[in-house]
């Protein structure tokens, strides 16, 4: 899980999701998981 100021899609499998006010990227590739913070 990477914590970043700006979350971006890295590949076409990445999806941007907002969960309880936190922007996250979920992907089948574990390295692509990100959270805004």
UniProtKB/Swiss-Prot annotation:
GO terms for cellular component: cytoplasm; ribonucleoprotein complex; ribosome. PROSITE patterns: RIBOSOMAL_L36. One of its GO terms (biological process) is translation. InterPro entries: Ribosomal_bL36 (IPR000473), Ribosomal_bL36_sp (IPR035977). GO terms for molecular function: structural constituent of ribosome. It comes from the Bacteria. Keywords: Ribonucleoprotein, Ribosomal protein. The keyword Ribosomal protein applies. Belongs to the bacterial ribosomal protein bL36 family. HAMAP family: Ribosomal_bL36. PANTHER family: 50S RIBOSOMAL PROTEIN L36, CHLOROPLASTIC, LARGE RIBOSOMAL SUBUNIT PROTEIN BL36C. This is Large ribosomal subunit protein bL36.
